Amino acid sequence: MIKLIRGFRDILPGQVELWQDIESKARVLLENFGFREIRLPIMESTELFARGIGADTDIVEKEMYTFPDSKGRGQTLRPEATASVVRSYIEHGYAGSDPVQKFYTIGPMFRHERPQKGRYRQFYQINAEMFGVASPLADVQIMYMLHLFFTGLDVPDVVTHVNSLGCPECRPKFREALISFVSDKMDRLCSDCQRRADANPLRVIDCKVPGCKEAVQGAPSIQDHLCPDCKEHFEAVIKGLDGLNVPYEIDPRLVRGLDYYTRTTFEVQTTLLGAQNAVAGGGRYDGLVKILGGKETPAIGFAVGFDRLAALLGAEEKDFTVPPALFIAALGDEARKIAFGWLCDFNARGVRAEMDYEGKSLKSQMKQANRFNAGRVLILGENELQNGMAVLRNMDTKEQEEVALDGLTDRVAALINQG
């Protein structure tokens, strides 16, 4: 038997309904805030992610699924969506013609990392990206949307952790202070952090290796190195969150795992998923459009971890299954032929209906209707054909009535729609 590849999974009926509910609520919220859906390919040029995410990040160095094409050019299954959205934004001329845009996308991402609770090699994200707005009000709105989203889903114990990573003007001073801090702790750092310490010391702060996390305790805070403009921007963000009553914590150690972030960065965290405690995250990436070949354009966005969110909500064992309103029990070939026509008619009208296709006994078919938890059963056999009347049984009240075969689907559909 061929089995699933490690780190991948099937999302089965009973689970899918929860995912559909989350997705539906996300679409409504995003579109209420003016975001429009964009659908993107799952494979892009490897260069897009190397330039966009950062060549020194764990994602690019270790986690990407990359394949050569027939000419030896690298192609990569997307490990995140933002770089792809930016590529599309530039390629289709938005940056030049109408730079203020809001997009969202929902779909699978791929990273070759160690599978664990809430983490898979194919995982799903809800992504929202806003281009062309430099105001801190955009940052506030993005985090407020996430607050509304998780509140609307009744997700417990969530709080937004927020930080500022500064800009190209103030980050070099912080970088120097950080390099100086880690220089005498190199022997306590993992091999990756030792290699990255000079070129990209922020990655040392972001490292999840316990020894590295311990070594950087007491490291300089970016908050102490912000330039006046970045400090003013961050203060405006905090004031905006206060004004909208969004729960937050200022977290000077929050740097995220992507190099494109500038100024505001944030994570929505919960205590209910163990070590994998972030269910959403994002931030500002004002330089990314230019890095990828477009004009300098302010931008901000977020990604929601669909798998972790579904695991969190699924723990409450909500039942999203919608049972059929009608089960048709047919006895005999002629009755089954007529019943199949009714079934198709009901389904076309939007009535959720099922039937037995195999010619089982009435007793077996009634058991099947119970397993489906059908609201009503329509019975058609030889006697009903002779009398010109089918039997309609209410499975809750056990009451039953006869319904004329002529015009039956009209009358039964009307009864079901009445409740």
UniProtKB/Swiss-Prot annotation:
UniProt keyword annotations, A-Z: Aminoacyl-tRNA synthetase, ATP-binding, Cytoplasm, Ligase, Nucleotide-binding, Protein biosynthesis
EC number: 6.1.1.21
Main location class: cytoplasm
Domain of life the protein comes from: Bacteria
Gene Ontology MF: a single term: histidine-tRNA ligase activity
Gene3D superfamilies found in the cross-reference section: Anticodon-binding domain (3.40.50.800), Bira Bifunctional Protein, Domain 2 (3.30.930.10)
GO cellular component, one term: cytoplasm
Catalytic activity: tRNA(His) + L-histidine + ATP = L-histidyl-tRNA(His) + AMP + diphosphate + H(+)
Subcellular location per the Swiss-Prot or TrEMBL entry: Cytoplasm
SUPFAM superfamilies documented for this protein: Class II aaRS ABD-related, Class II aaRS and biotin synthetases
Gene Ontology biological-process annotations: histidyl-tRNA aminoacylation
CDD domains: HisRS-like_core, HisRS_anticodon
Enzyme type, top EC level: ligase
Protein family according to the UniProt entry: Belongs to the class-II aminoacyl-tRNA synthetase family.
Known partners and oligomeric status: Homodimer.
Name of the protein in its database record: Histidine--tRNA ligase
Organism: Desulfatibacillum aliphaticivorans
Gene this chain is encoded by: hisS
